């Protein structure tokens, strides 16, 4: 996950989970609570490049004209602490996550010579009450609302183009 930490007191004020899309179907192994108390949290110590390479393993691609489209990412579990809302923290998280994915694709892209641009798709399931926030970041609503975890949600999608 991407974590936003306030500099003055090192308090976590927001989190965002970045998932490769489509979400991998292989079963993930999880550490037990006991193992987490005796060792560092999994993922710590991994290089930025290693995490991006792992993310890229699950990407699918298609070439349309001069653009290679990557399946991109699904953002999930986006949360900002109540006392930090309305201060731009959510925007920082989403824009930071998008930049991380774009950097991963640009650094690990393997594309044919006729490709001059990379396209990346971002998706998320938004609670209806914060739909306008995601629309302000360029996401577009896809389909009808649905219930998820007891709250009405809407699927949102955004496509980004970048040079190779």
Name each model-derived stretch.
Residues 3, 10-21, 29, 46, ...:
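Conserved beta-strand in the GNAT
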Residues 21-23, 83, 129-131, 161:
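Short coil/turn motifs at secondary-structure junctions
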Residues 27-68, 103-112, 161-164:
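Eukaryotic N-terminal low-complexity, Ser/Thr- and Lys/Arg-rich leader segments
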């Amino acid at each position: 996950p991407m974590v936003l930490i306030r500099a003055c007191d090192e308090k976590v004020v927001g989190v965002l989970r970045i998932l490769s899309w489509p979400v991998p179907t292989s079963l993930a192994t999880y550490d037990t609570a006991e193992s987490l108390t005796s060792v560092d949290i999994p993922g710590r110590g991994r290089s930025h490049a290693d995490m991006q390479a792992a993310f890229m393993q699950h990407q699918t691609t298609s070439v349309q004209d001069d653009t290679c489209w990557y399946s991109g990412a699904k953002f999930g579990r986006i949360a900002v602490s109540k006392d930090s809302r309305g201060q731009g923290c959510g925007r920082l998280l989403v824009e930071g996550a998008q930049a991380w994915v774009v950097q991963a694709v640009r650094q690990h892209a393997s594309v044919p010579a006729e490709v001059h641009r990379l396209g990346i798709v971002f998706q998320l399931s938004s609670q209806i009450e914060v739909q306008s926030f995601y629309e302000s970041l360029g996401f577009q609503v896809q389909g009808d609302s649905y219930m998820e975890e007891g709250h009405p949600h809407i699927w949102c999608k955004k496509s980004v183009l970048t040079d190779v």
